């Protein structure tokens, strides 16, 4: 049958090796179960090293992959003796070659490969910026058609380190529409013949691609970290590393205790933080994100603004936080900018806004006593090296092929 099967977390129904986002019986997540229970590393650069726990048959030959290194200067500043940085971005001096500068590229490579292996339709996705850039890059490399819907706030983030190809189709939305509006429009486009939804957090190729951040850390450190820090918008990254950690626990060589998830959202838009403070499985919009669109506009790290995150679904972020006794933080713009300046001055690489939010949450955790000096900590910087990339590459802006005034626009108007 191949190297994995899909299993529904609620009813237990199993599916073969296919591109499937949902169970036919219920709304719970599907999870990949790999035939190899021990992690076998391939002699490949980048993400392809972790082939045995990725849902693809052909090897991924990209040099893009996560790196992990032990911090010295920043760790010393915080008084931590075992701080490791998981860096997804462009930093060739450290062996980091993600040319879209975001860990979303870890999702894009296996997703596009899985699609190619299971029918080869055009992929449709919504993006606040980073995901779209990653999928556009892989589309330009492979020639697989991709349709990307972005709110106006994300359009400037849609650049490539190579000239865009005809396989990349960008649809931007008019001012006043946000990421969730983009998700709704993309959902409609994905129903057209020959199209398939990229699936967001429901896509096991995305989750297991991002989970390689935890795999790389465990292999580098020799064990799973005690604590894991990341900024979240949908929470998919947090879910991904939790699932990867469970596989590592089954492997047996990397420890039995799951890392404690310490995740951050960016004020004023913090619906998952609000729900988790009350240990609620449900996000209540009128309580947790009152006047959401205004909050989204005021958020520094705009990519962290999903109004419909996979929080309460079985196998979603609520379950990940519960299983790891997790903590969530609400970070201000000022805290993020201060953390960014401190990190960049000490470590010598530029980081993107979500990484700044994650860094600020670590500073807060140290201040509040949520980590101790000698514990092993993994700070996942999910994007960085943009300034460094510009020293080596010419960047090309992707021009939209159409503009949508709202998510309910007639698809004929878009001329897809």
UniProtKB/Swiss-Prot annotation:
UniProt keywords, alphabetically: Coenzyme M biosynthesis, Pyridoxal phosphate, Transferase
UniProt EC number: 2.5.1.76
Gene3D superfamilies: 3.40.50.1100
Disulfide links within the chain: none
A GO molecular function held by the record: magnesium ion binding
Pathway(s) annotated for this protein in UniProt: Cofactor biosynthesis; coenzyme M biosynthesis
SUPFAM superfamilies for the chain: Tryptophan synthase beta subunit-like PLP-dependent enzymes
Cofactor field: pyridoxal 5'-phosphate
GO term, biological process aspect, one: coenzyme M biosynthetic process
Residues engaged in binding pyridoxal 5'-phosphate: 130
Its job: Specifically catalyzes the beta-elimination of phosphate from L-phosphoserine and the beta-addition of sulfite to the dehydroalanine intermediate to produce L-cysteate.
Similarity field: Belongs to the threonine synthase family. Cysteate synthase subfamily.
NCBIfam families: cysteate_syn
Protein name in the entry: Cysteate synthase
Species per Swiss-Prot/TrEMBL record: Methanosarcina barkeri (strain Fusaro / DSM 804)
